[in-house]
Amino acid sequence: MKSNNLATEGINSLPLDHGENDAIRVSVLSEALPYIQKFAGRRIVIKYGGSAMSKESLKEAVFRDIALLSSVGAQPVIIHGGGPEINHWLTKLEIKSEFRDGLRITDSNTMDIVEMVLIGRVNKQIVNGINKVGASAVGLCGIDGKLIEARPWGDGSYGLVGEVARVNADVIEPLIANGYIPVISSVASSVEGINYNINADTVAGEIAAAIGAEKLILLTDTSGILKNKSDPLSLIQNIRLSDMRELIDKEVVNGGMTPKAECCIRALAQGVNAAHIIDGRIPHALLLEVFTDKGIGTMIVSRS
């Protein structure tokens, strides 16, 4: 286990009002203790994306949260997207983007940019950020060691958009066992050697199932799943798997939230204990969701 200094730094940097006394911090630590004990030695798969990737202050908060999870004995595994950065480079190179059902239509020119950005830039920035705050991260993509076998999405009309055919968890098990934090980008190859862009939420769900994760956590730009999209106070804090399917059928969950909800459903159906959709725009959202009684987002479970 890494130095406990990370745990102290993480708690000290929680978003408490200036001047709050030591009793508040003791209360925070006391509330966190049973969760720290519960998740020691458990795998927590985190899909890192949205505004938490683009704002420097949020980036550091996420990296510290991840380091703290590792410091207290949990085993985080990070899956990342990179949509804003991909959009930036596509615009810069005058390549048009098209989305359908929350997925980016990917031709060969777009795929070149996706690979460059996700594997060459974003992945290494995340690894460096986690390493900088005292943990030890290792960057991978689905191609490495045949970690993820891809196949075309649907009927192939999405271009080089893929889905997960198989996960070879043996590639990352030694890293996890030795205290490293795998950081995985969602580019993978088919058995024919064709590279595909896979939705990072989907990859996170399949990785979580393959490694027997306790939790799957998706960092998003929403507060969670809302009963009414126009009412931020209509957050659903806890929901059963069967009720989640009903929300999709009734199109209460739609658009870009659909692949997130579906990946949570698939992960739970394959044995993951809980899935969480939380607001990555809130500093230290991970700690607030994992180590507090109330949490801050939507938790999906197989049963009550």
From Swiss-Prot:
Catalyzes the ATP-dependent phosphorylation of N-acetyl-L-glutamate. Keywords: Amino-acid biosynthesis, Arginine biosynthesis, ATP-binding, Cytoplasm, Kinase, Nucleotide-binding, Transferase. Substrate binds at residues 82-83, 104, 197. One of its GO terms (cellular component) is cytoplasm. It comes from the Bacteria. The gene is argB. This is Acetylglutamate kinase. Gene3D superfamilies: Acetylglutamate kinase-like. GO terms for molecular function: acetylglutamate kinase activity; ATP binding. The record marks 47, 260 as: Transition state stabilizer. Pfam families: AA_kinase.
